[in-house]
Amino acid sequence: MTIERTFSIVKPNAVAKNAIGAIYARFESAGFTIVASKMLRLSREQAEGFYAEHKGKPFFDGLVEFMMSGPIMVQALEGENAVQRNRDIMGATNPANALAGTLRADYADSFTANAVHGSDSIESAQREIAYFFSDDEICPRA
C-alpha cells in the first residue's frame, strides 16, 4: 500500500454553490484524509504563480481571472494512490467529457469553471502543496 499526498482546489464556482462540504464528503468517502485545508482569495500574483506552467497558452488569462473571481478552498489529501484516485474522482478536465458521478460532472459549469483542480503527478502535488502550505500546516493523522 502506497500512501501519497495530493493537492486539490475547490474552485470559485463550486465555492459559490456552497458545495465545499459535499466535495469534502466525497474525498472522505473515497478514503482520503484531509491533512491541510484553508479558504483564501488568490491575488493576481498568486494565481499567475500557481499556473505559471500555462503562461502563454490561450486560456491562461481567463483562468487567472476566474481563479481570482471568488474564494477558493485549497487542501492536501492523503491516501493510497492519492494522485490518480483524486483525478478519477474529479473526472475529465472538460466537464462535457466527465463521467456521471464525478465532481466535475456534478459541479462544473464550463471548461475553466470546472469545480476542482487536482495534481497530475506526485512531483506536482509536492510543489503545489508547498505553494500554499508550510510544513507546520500539514497535520497527518494515524
Swiss-Prot record:
Q: Does the keyword Transferase apply?
A: yes
Q: Which reaction does it catalyse?
A: a 2'-deoxyribonucleoside 5'-diphosphate + ATP = a 2'-deoxyribonucleoside 5'-triphosphate + ADP; a ribonucleoside 5'-diphosphate + ATP = a ribonucleoside 5'-triphosphate + ADP
Pfam families named in the record: NDK
| Gene3D superfamilies, alphabetized | Nucleoside diphosphate kinase-like domain (3.30.70.141)
Q: Where is the active site?
A: H117
Q: Which GO terms describe its cellular component?
A: cytoplasm
List the protein's name: Nucleoside diphosphate kinase
